[in-house]
């Protein structure tokens, strides 16, 4: 997950992407790039994908679940054409097929331009939620010495608590206050 990965929200640097792509190309090791959050950047688009650096040696995985509707459970991949038969076979072995209705819905929202208009709206909402979360963390946890990531996209913030604070013990208190986290 090079873009805004779960759980830290971090993004792979341009230098690291270049190094991974060069190593994969030199060794012939294929790159499977899972980028479900790649469209959820806030101010600046991420660097070019790993897959764009070596299209014949890469498989790029994307998702509509994060930018359109989680219930659709629909994604896509970009791969060398020679891999399609094996990828299709693996997909069919996993779940036979994705419901046709879901596929048609996504095809329509792409075709009529809705998705292009919708994604900036989603980005703005996630950015506002990120800003609210960072402000709350600063207000509530800042005095404790906790540290957290400052994600530039995606849905995740990684918090490191001081050793004296126990995340497992804090979880029930957070739930009682109407909030949850993964310890």
Stretches found by the model and what they are:
Residues 1-183:
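PLP-dependent class I/II
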